[in-house]
Amino acid sequence: MGTSQAVDSSPPDGTGVIQLDPWLEPFRDALKQRFSFIEGWVKAINETEGGLETFSKGYERFGLNVQSNGDIIYREWAPNAVQAQLVGEFNNWDVTAHPMTKNGFGVWEVTVPAVNGAPAIPHDSKIKISMVIPSGERIYRIPAWIKRVVQDLSVSPTYEAVFWNPPTEKQYKFQYSRPKRPESLRIYEAHVGISSPETKVATYKEFTSNMLPRIKYLGYNAIQLMAIMEHAYYASFGYQVNNFFAASSRYGTPEDLKELVDKAHSMGLVVLLDVVHSHASKNVLDGLNMFDGTDHLYFHGGGKGRHELWDSRLFNYGHHEVLRFLLSNLRFWMEEYGFDGFRFDGVTSMLYTHHGIGTGFSGGYHEYFGSSVDEEGVMYLTLANEMLHNLYPNCITVAEDVSGMPALCLPHSLGGVGFDYRLAMAVPDMYIKLLKEKKDDEWDIGNLSFTLTNRRHGEKTIAYAESHDQALVGDKTLMMWLCDKEMYTHMSVLTEFTPIIERGMALHKLIRLVTHGLGGEGYLNFEGNEFGHPEWLDFPRDGNNNSFWYARRQLNLTEDHLLRYKFLNDFDRAMQLTEEKYGWLHSPQAYVSLKNETDKVLVFERAGLLWIFNFHPTNSFTDYRVGVEQSGTYRIVLDTDDPAFGGLNRNLKETRFFTTDLSWNGRSNFLQVYIPTRTALVLALEETL
């Protein structure tokens, strides 16, 4: 049964998922309880706030908002404070000038009257909220809903809040509508600050002019932007967020980011934000921690509110105002900046009370129910997906979860959490394990195939061979595992094509292609990895003398025609463009007809294409018999051994392969093909070329 059929016929109690996965039958009551708990929150929000649509527009009520007459209304939730004042350069930081009043829900408010019809707080001027807490201490904080903060490292690493309200003529005006949602999602994961070969922090403007055309040329149709939400510590890779409504100022202004998103849309690229709602920076002076003098405003109090490994604060998803803050944060990034969706970071930490720390997941269904599940975290993620998909039907949401929770990518109506895709996190781990622990002739083709195809029925998966995680210092990219130090000496076409480089380039292409073809309903690549970027990522920090040497992407390597990186880059482009033509990512899962452990040959069919992989390190096979369902004449549409991709050209592009009407490996026909060592061929019926 398909997902849409299940939705149509499912009972209205959250147990519809059982029709798709009967193994969930023993957990019927738990599914009902989960569904009922979430519905209870939906009902409460409908009754008290007028529904998720109104509730998620908190940024129009909280923070600083300019009225049509020029007045500025500032509201802040800080129930523990006994006094509160808005201070800034506009009133010489005078704590008596703009006192705030508190309502019964702990929300403080002040109106700053306009001066001659214009806002009294100048654009880009510094502001803070000053509060007195019950002990009598006066504290200063950055407004929780602030839209811009800036950092002057020559003065202090602490961020300062500024009032962002540029004059009309300096406000970026969006010119392009959102592209339609891609049927096949091909994601280019990128970090603005490292997107330059120079040893510096690159800017939004530079990304717009340099990276967008590159991503479009490579054939990707989606960009996933990391480290956009403001984070004081650059080396955190954006995962220790201080200010949730502020776009990082180290790359430029909010208007620059709007231009980036708009220009991406003009190229038909959708833009996803890497959103971090799994935890927050523990910073006090420029974060949410201890905001009103308590440790339990936005977060759980005590140890429950601290993540042991990340050294950060954990949100209390079961609090009405925290839900308002987080749901409004998602809505804000969609509305203000025009993002097309989100990749949710650290979902495993949100789903479980143990946060995945010291816990392995066996796949036993009992692990997904019971006391170890954070039902409030599940509820928040479900409400987030409900809100986003109801308001923005083309919105894309991706979950980073290692646990394999059932129904994560099914709609709430079936008892699911509502994500569109989950990341196939076991796949890159498999490749690292193979390269670290196995000789090439020990590769288990059956396990390779199983890992790539082991995904939940009806739930979409984004496959990837490696992401930013594998590029970070302390780990190695696939190309570094494959070629190691020879990357520095033998990637020139003027040098010997050594066995190590030949093997490395061949397997780099094979790994990417088999992942793309077999691994999911979407594909992701981290910038630079498409061409085998040398070295790792290491941001400036005390441990490396604040060096930018490894905090950059040497994208210029592909432009040097004397280097072999161009071959890998061109192969990656051909792979994306071939997918665009044949659409295997949105086709049904592949039929695998052969997993030959002796020959190290893998054969499967998907989207009308025949995929043939020879992973054997030394053996090539002549007239190798391969089963195929559809009869006819086949031609090569992609060949990893093509000289255009640095290959040895052992199969001619013009070769025709004719089927024979005899069954083979469970298929109605077979054809015979020459498959050289460490190569892959993708064949298509001649009439589809």
UniProtKB/Swiss-Prot annotation:
<dbReference type="InterPro" id="IPR006047">
    <property type="entry name" value="Glyco_hydro_13_cat_dom"/>
</dbReference>
<dbReference type="Pfam" id="PF02806">
    <property type="entry name" value="Alpha-amylase_C"/>
</dbReference>
<dbReference type="Pfam" id="PF02922">
    <property type="entry name" value="CBM_48"/>
</dbReference>
<comment type="similarity">
    <text>Belongs to the glycosyl hydrolase 13 family. GlgB subfamily.</text>
</comment>
<comment type="pathway">
    <text>Glycan biosynthesis; glycogen biosynthesis.</text>
</comment>
<dbReference type="InterPro" id="IPR017853">
    <property type="entry name" value="Glycoside_hydrolase_SF"/>
</dbReference>
<feature type="binding site">
    <location>
        <position position="128"/>
    </location>
    <ligand>
        <name>(1,4-alpha-D-glucosyl)n</name>
    </ligand>
</feature>
<keyword id="KW-0963">Cytoplasm</keyword>
<feature type="site" description="Transition state stabilizer">
    <location>
        <position position="469"/>
    </location>
</feature>
<dbReference type="InterPro" id="IPR037439">
    <property type="entry name" value="Branching_enzy"/>
</dbReference>
<dbReference type="InterPro" id="IPR014756">
    <property type="entry name" value="Ig_E-set"/>
</dbReference>
<dbReference type="InterPro" id="IPR006048">
    <property type="entry name" value="A-amylase/branching_C"/>
</dbReference>
<protein>
    <recommendedName>
        <fullName>1,4-alpha-glucan-branching enzyme</fullName>
        <ecNumber>2.4.1.18</ecNumber>
    </recommendedName>
</protein>
<dbReference type="GO" id="GO:0005737">
    <property type="term" value="C:cytoplasm"/>
</dbReference>
<keyword id="KW-0328">Glycosyltransferase</keyword>
<dbReference type="InterPro" id="IPR013780">
    <property type="entry name" value="Glyco_hydro_b"/>
</dbReference>
<feature type="active site" description="Proton donor">
    <location>
        <position position="400"/>
    </location>
</feature>
<keyword id="KW-0808">Transferase</keyword>
<comment type="function">
    <text>Glycogen-branching enzyme participates in the glycogen biosynthetic process along with glycogenin and glycogen synthase. Generates alpha-1,6-glucosidic branches from alpha-1,4-linked glucose chains, to increase solubility of the glycogen polymer.</text>
</comment>
<keyword id="KW-0320">Glycogen biosynthesis</keyword>
<dbReference type="InterPro" id="IPR004193">
    <property type="entry name" value="Glyco_hydro_13_N"/>
</dbReference>
<feature type="binding site">
    <location>
        <position position="93"/>
    </location>
    <ligand>
        <name>(1,4-alpha-D-glucosyl)n</name>
    </ligand>
</feature>
<dbReference type="GO" id="GO:0043169">
    <property type="term" value="F:cation binding"/>
</dbReference>
<dbReference type="InterPro" id="IPR013783">
    <property type="entry name" value="Ig-like_fold"/>
</dbReference>
<feature type="active site" description="Nucleophile">
    <location>
        <position position="345"/>
    </location>
</feature>
<dbReference type="GO" id="GO:0004553">
    <property type="term" value="F:hydrolase activity, hydrolyzing O-glycosyl compounds"/>
</dbReference>
<dbReference type="GO" id="GO:0003844">
    <property type="term" value="F:1,4-alpha-glucan branching enzyme activity"/>
</dbReference>
<dbReference type="GO" id="GO:0005978">
    <property type="term" value="P:glycogen biosynthetic process"/>
</dbReference>
<dbReference type="Pfam" id="PF00128">
    <property type="entry name" value="Alpha-amylase"/>
</dbReference>
